[in-house]
């Protein structure tokens, strides 16, 4: 669709995934913690899990951490947390970066996640975070 892009890179024992999504900006409330989490879950549900009817969502066990910052004059929100698969046993860390494009009045989010059940995830997460910094 026009508002969602998902791709992933598969390793033998791990997976890195990327979502880029956008939606209309409706004022400051569009960047609230509740709105960002709701948007993430709405778009993450489009990523199918391994079993029928399963899909990605944000873990309810740990509350995501939010950080507001400015980069080159633009306001951003970083959200870090853990994702799960509703209806299956998968999960891992994620980080997302959200900003508003004032020219189009749209919110844009780059969301990166890692699945690596047997290996440490730190280096995989650093790689996906680097995609934002480049």
Regions found by a protein language model. Give the residues of each.
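Surface-exposed amphipathic alpha-helical segments
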Residues: 1, 105-134
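Secretory pathway targeting signatures of secreted, lumenal, and periplasmic proteins
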Residues: 2-49
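Short, flexible beta-strand-to-coil junctions
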Residues: 11-12, 23-27, 82-85, 112-118
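Glycine-rich, often proline-containing surface loops adjacent to acidic residues and nearby aromatics
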Residues: 16-19, 75-78, 105-111
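A short, polar/proline- and glycine-enriched secondary-structure boundary/capping micro-motif
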Residues: 17-19, 29-32, 89-90, 119-124
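Short, low-complexity, polar/charged sequence segments that are solvent-exposed and flexible
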Residues: 26-27, 38-42, 97-101, 128-132
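Signature of long, low-cysteine stretches enriched in small and polar/charged residues
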Residues: 47-104
């Amino acid at each position: 669709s026009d508002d969602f892009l998902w791709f992933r890179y598969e390793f033998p024992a791990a997976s890195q995934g990327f979502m880029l999504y956008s939606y209309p900006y409706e004022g400051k409330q569009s960047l609230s913690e509740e709105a960002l989490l709701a948007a993430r879950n709405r778009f993450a549900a489009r990523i199918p899990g391994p079993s029928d009817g399963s899909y990605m969502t944000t873990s309810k066990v740990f509350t995501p951490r939010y950080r507001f910052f400015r980069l080159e004059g633009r306001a951003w929100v970083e959200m870090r947390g853990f994702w799960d698969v509703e209806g299956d046993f998968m999960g891992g860390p994620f980080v997302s970066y959200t900003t508003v494009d004032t020219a189009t009045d749209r919110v844009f989010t780059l969301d990166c996640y890692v699945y690596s059940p047997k290996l440490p995830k730190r280096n995989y997460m650093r790689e996906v975070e680097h995609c934002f910094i480049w």
